[in-house]
């Protein structure tokens, strides 16, 4: 048994010693079978939430009404959830009521996809009543039971299905795919925040291109923020190598760039994204407008925009044009390393120095002089030392020698 499960084994053993059933469930078991990195370990048990909290000294009630308690074991937090069933769903997104049960089978039966409905006991034996292992072996995503019923319970499951395509490279079971096509409109009931979370995971996956194509094919894109009129652009976006975009800002920036979005800020706000990310994307897009070609970078421009923003913009441009991303990043890094100063903070003089030397009160002129000095330092006209800069200003007849 792999280490992440070993660390949590004490929880299962404690529950079993007190007469309860307990199993590892969900994504961790799936990822074990896929030989992927194992994330959070989740445990399902026949013990009720109150019973779980009585057994363990350190617990956090994060939703006992829905059956979930966090147990802190050896300094690590684990979600322990009581076996449960769910009644009719409300608004295509949440169950009207949760009923605690003592049956693992009933608990697994309520889950979304067969690959996520596998349990593992303390000895490593798998309990797989719905064919999850077979689905994994065949690289197929299919629902537990009737896909139309699963998607009408929680419409976000349709996005999750395609997100898993993006992450795992699996194919959609034909019945599952057809149910998404027929029920795509239900996605309109889902909050933007939940859709954004799934969409970001989709874009981050190694098979994002395949997933984007499926968003169009199934019609789900029609119910995603500001994508209704972007069918052709999305199909084009699916042809690019998204693996080369290695940050959140680069992925959203590339999407705006390829979709020809008029206002990136409006588009990203529609997805309820944070202001910091919006500013990051806007900067990358501004660079692409300001610097027409990757060969147009100068020391001054790179100092102005900064290496991180420059690399983001050039990555977007390179992926869009099919050019060598690493080559452009390397050139930018080399140019940046050649800069005598990398940021404004590294300049040897301050605004106070300038006001003292010029014998004048502050104003916009101070920033103009500092910018002039920055350019001179960057281009090697003067060393970045306070005395040298002062002499340079005198030599340029900008200040009188006696003002020092």
From Swiss-Prot:
GO MF: ATP binding; CCA tRNA nucleotidyltransferase activity; magnesium ion binding; tRNA binding
Q: Which reaction does it catalyse?
A: a tRNA precursor + 2 CTP + ATP = a tRNA with a 3' CCA end + 3 diphosphate; a tRNA with a 3' CCA end + 2 CTP + ATP = a tRNA with a 3' CCACCA end + 3 diphosphate
What EC designation does it have? Answer: 2.7.7.72
Q: Which UniProt keywords apply?
A: ATP-binding, Magnesium, Metal-binding, Nucleotide-binding, Nucleotidyltransferase, RNA repair, RNA-binding, Transferase, tRNA processing
Which amino acids does the record list as binding CTP?
27, 30, 111, 154, 157, 160, 163
Cysteine pairs forming cystine bridges in this chain are none
Binding residue positions for Mg(2+)? 40, 42
The record's family statement is: Belongs to the tRNA nucleotidyltransferase/poly(A) polymerase family. Bacterial CCA-adding enzyme type 3 subfamily.
Tell me which NCBIfam families the record gives. PRK13299.1
Q: What else is known?
A: A single active site specifically recognizes both ATP and CTP and is responsible for their addition.
> Cross-referenced PANTHER family, in alphabetical order?
CCA TRNA NUCLEOTIDYLTRANSFERASE 1, MITOCHONDRIAL (PTHR46173:SF1)
Protein's name according to its UniProt entry: CCA-adding enzyme
Q: Which organism does this sequence originate in?
A: Geobacillus sp. (strain WCH70)
Phylogenetic lineage: Bacteria, Bacillati, Bacillota, Bacilli, Bacillales
This protein's gene is called cca
């Amino acid at each position: 048994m792999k280490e992440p499960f070993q660390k949590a084994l004490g929880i299962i053993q404690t529950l079993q010693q007190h007469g309860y059933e307990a199993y590892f469930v969900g994504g961790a078991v799936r990822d074990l079978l896929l030989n992927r990195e194992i994330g959070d370990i989740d445990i399902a048990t026949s013990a009720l939430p109150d019973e779980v909290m009585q057994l363990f000294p350190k617990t956090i009630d994060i939703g006992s009404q829905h059956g979930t308690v966090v147990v802190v074991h050896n300094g690590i937090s684990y979600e322990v959830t009581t076996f449960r069933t769910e009644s009719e769903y409300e608004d295509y997104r949440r169950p009207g009521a949760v009923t605690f049960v003592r049956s693992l089978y009933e608990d697994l039966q309520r889950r979304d996809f067969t690959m996520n409905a596998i349990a593992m006991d303390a000895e490593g034996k798998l309990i797989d009543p719905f064919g999850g292992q077979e689905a994994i072996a065949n690289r197929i995503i299919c629902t537990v039971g009737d896909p139309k019923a699963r998607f009408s319970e929680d419409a976000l499951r349709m996005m999750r299905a395609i997100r898993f395509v993006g992450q795992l490279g699996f194919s959609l079971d034909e019945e599952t795919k057809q149910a998404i096509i027929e029920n795509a409109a239900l996605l309109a009931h889902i909050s933007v925040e939940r859709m954004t979370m799934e969409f970001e995971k989709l874009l981050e996956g190694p098979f994002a291109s395949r997933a984007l194509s499926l968003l169009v094919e199934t019609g789900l894109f029609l119910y995603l923020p500001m994508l209704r009129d972007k069918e052709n652009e999305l199909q084009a976006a699916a042809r690019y190598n998204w693996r080369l975009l290695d940050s959140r800002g680069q992925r959203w920036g590339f999407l705006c760039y390829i979709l020809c979005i008029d206002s990136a800020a409006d588009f990203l706000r529609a997805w309820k994204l944070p202001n910091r990310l919006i500013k990051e994307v806007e900067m990358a897009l501004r660079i692409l407008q300001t610097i027409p070609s990757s060969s147009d970078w100068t020391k001054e421009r790179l100092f102005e925009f900064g290496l991180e923003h420059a690399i983001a913009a050039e990555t977007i441009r390179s992926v869009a044009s099919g050019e060598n991303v690493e080559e452009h990043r390397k050139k930018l890094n080399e140019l940046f390393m050649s800069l005598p100063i990398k940021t404004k903070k590294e300049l040897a003089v301050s605004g106070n120095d300038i006001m003292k030397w010029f014998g004048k009160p502050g104003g916009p002129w101070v920033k103009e002089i500092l910018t002039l000095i920055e350019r001179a330092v960057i281009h090697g006209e003067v060393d970045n030392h306070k005395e040298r800069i002062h002499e340079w200003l005198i030599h340029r007849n900008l200040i009188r020698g006696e003002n020092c």
